[in-house]
From Swiss-Prot:
Family matches, as CDD domains: Influenza_NA (cd15483)
Region of interest (Disordered), ranges: 325-349
Protein name: Neuraminidase
Organism per entry: Influenza A virus (strain A/Singapore/1/1957 H2N2)
Stretches for region Hypervariable stalk region: 36-88
Positions of substrate binding: 118, 152, 276-277, 292, 371
Binding partners and assembly: Homotetramer.
Activity control note: Inhibited by the neuraminidase inhibitors zanamivir (Relenza) and oseltamivir (Tamiflu). These drugs interfere with the release of progeny virus from infected cells and are effective against all influenza strains. Resistance to neuraminidase inhibitors is quite rare.
Amino acid sequence: MNPNQKIITIGSVSLTIATVCFLMQIAILATTVTLHFKQHECDSPASNQVMPCEPIIIERNITEIVYLNNTTIEKEICPEVVEYRNWSKPQCQITGFAPFSKDNSIRLSAGGDIWVTREPYVSCDPGKCYQFALGQGTTLDNKHSNGTIHDRIPHRTLLMNELGVPFHLGTKQVCVAWSSSSCHDGKAWLHVCVTGDDRNATASFIYDGRLVDSIGSWSQNILRTQESECVCINGTCTVVMTDGSASGRADTRILFIKEGKIVHISPLSGSAQHIEECSCYPRYPDVRCICRDNWKGSNRPVIDINMEDYSIDSSYVCSGLVGDTPRNDDSSSNSNCRDPNNERGNPGVKGWAFDNGDDVWMGRTINKDSRSGYETFKVIGGWSTPNSKSQVNRQVIVDNNNWSGYSGIFSVEGKSCINRCFYVELIRGRPQETRVWWTSNSIVVFCGTSGTYGTGSWPDGANINFMPI
């Protein structure tokens, strides 16, 4: 090869290398620009698909820095899109219940500023559980606590804290309410808050911290709701509300709410005669509630809510071991699945149960006449067989020498199944303990377990003689 050919060859190779390097730099620059500005295109549908017209909530936005040959590329990670809950997983199979939480509010009130409350409940968002209660507008060691046995005053508010955190002075007052229900649809909290005159109360519907809708009393006789969590499926939440006599015929309606707006109201239908203070749980694709018949029955009413067509059916828990208080002795109590048993129906107490195939898990006071003690058990055939009384897996939650109160259910979604949990209200003060002038409560919480468990009793534990009068 002569010198001229060598020069031409070397020049050609150099030009080729330079061209390749130039193209690589252009590619790197294009990649950088594309990654930086393409965040909004993540998971975009094909051009012939219709995008839903609804807001997308961004939980977090993370920037990753990747180093390529001394060139820095800032890569925007696609944000998570928050979805509505649908509760489509199966119910967890359990052997019983294990302790989960206890707030010790009354014991702490002996030496600290803790709210006077009643009607507590628990509900969870997708990541965390919260405890709620209706405050009396006062702490316990305060003269305003005198007379807090009364249910409905304009100073009552719905309190909300992380589960296990007592209602201290820094507790958030979510709304004005002497009756309430709360639930999280996967995107935000819905609070149903009832307050006002007995003959003309108002229910406010607060979603994501904003008042969205309201409804007034329809029977002018103490509009009221569940005192435990409502349930949301695919963005629609349902809550049971009653207006009318507490010991006679009343008007119960089931409301359907979408992001705080009432979208439908269904009347109660089926064989249930009286409905109060329902404890509801998701049973995909529908919702099921176990309630309190304060008129005719010590067996608990059941409401089945169809979330698609808004239809309602009702009946009674089949178990002959009935769940309300007061009630007959177990040997003489009855239930035929369809009708109230006409056994000591009035007054009653809020409670819960849930189906497990043909069986039923349930909780109730140990004392058949008053709100003392608390027990749970499963009744074989208790969901499908009239007057079934075969009891297994009994547990004592609160021994019969200590006071209990209301109880209710809440559901927690796990990786593979939906667990059922319950809380027990531990009432202290009046009317049973007349040394003091106040009425308040603490709570204890248990959740279903597939493991083994021991025994115990978890009462409130406060010495009434140590408490402010």
